[in-house]
Amino acid sequence: MEIEQIKLNGDERLIDALKSKGYTDIPSNVILDKTLTGIGATYAELHSCRNSIIIEPNVPVIVGKAAKNSDWLAVYSDTTVAQIKKYLKRTDVKYKKILTTPEGFKKVRKAADKSYSLIQETYFCLFDECEKLTQDCDYRASILQPVYDFFDFKEKAFVSATPLEMSRPAFEEQGFRKLKIVPQYDYRKDLHLIVTSSYERTVREEFQRLKDSPCVCIFLNSVTGINELVNSLHLEGESRIFCSEEGGGKLKDAGFTNAVSSIDYPLAKYNFFTSRFYSAVDIELNVKPDILILTNLNNAVYTTVDPYTEAIQIQGRFRRMFEDKQTFNSLTHITNTRDLGALSREELDKQIDEYKITYQSLIERYDKTTNSARKTSLKQQLKQICEDYLLDERLNIDYFGIDNKYNDCLLYTSDAADE
């Protein structure tokens, strides 16, 4: 894929850097690698002079951004098709701005009805935090629902500060290229990594170290793990938990009432965030926080934090820069270790090759046979591959699912040390 580098000076936002290269807006058919969080990619699209559909991975960022302007529409589980139809008909909004979850996208398509093809011709489609397609598709297949529609838009782009490599052929077929933002200053942040065999003791010691901090933000992708920490450290009266509504329900059943599903101020002294808050959302504070990232592999593998994406995204949630030009006091990641038995890259290559051979054989036999019983049997066998998230809902090869397996290989094996 062709790569174009664009310099970003210290006093510039993304749109300034783009304009220096002759782009008035985010161009079409690009994967925009911002390098830095918080430089205004979504902001640029929301304020562009064109109609836009912006796909965000989770609800909190959608609700937060749409609340800033009554001319922007948030589409998620609570939004009805009728509300979207009403918005599309508004004549007082010159440039429509629709922010939607991947799951909410089908409501936009349904609301547009016969005008949907016109929307694909005239709206710019921006898929924000695009690495989530690869990272989340194994447990959240619905995140891929808009993918086919996305590539049917005349103008579209992927964007993230931490994009992953994507193998879907459509990128090459449609001539996608990468725009790489290159900051002209040292933007690195110090992170204190603590690898321990005594997770509970180390976490307790870290909380003791942070007892005088005005605000501690803890990122741990386990509602159960958060609940255990709150109880064992007796933080009930001075903590808040930010998680999904489902997670909040579990906490309520456990007797914890101070859990919310979107950013809500003021924050407490101790604030816990699950993975839906790792990217995209803005956390605005009047005090400089201490950030603590926790990975407990003995509790759950899904508490693993990807150092190439999630760790970068987490520290980027904090937008306010204080007098010392910093956005936080400290950034610490505590993790234990465990042999996860993951495949090596070489082993995974062989496994994927076998899947593809099996798929090709089954699909050819399925297309050739006219016997309904045989078709049913072959379709069931294809669905078995689909259950391993290597086929999508149309029974085509799911390249994001394959990319997910390679990303896990990098994350969970010693191969990561070679990258």
Stretch-by-stretch model annotation:
Residues 52-62, 210-231:
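Conserved strand-helix element at the start of the C-terminal RecA-like helicase core
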Residues 412-419:
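Conserved small/polar residues in nucleotide/adenosyl-binding loops
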Residues 72-109:
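Inter-Walker segment of RecA-like/P-loop motor cores
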Residues 169-203:
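Interdomain hinge/linker at the junction between the two RecA-like core domains of SF2 helicases
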Residues 38-43, 106-111, 271-289, 313-317:
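SF2 helicase motor core recognition
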Residues 33-39, 131, 147-169:
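Conserved helicase ATPase motor motifs in RecA-like P-loop NTPase domains
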Residues 117-144:
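SF2 helicase catalytic motif II
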Residues 299-322:
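Conserved SF2 helicase motif VI
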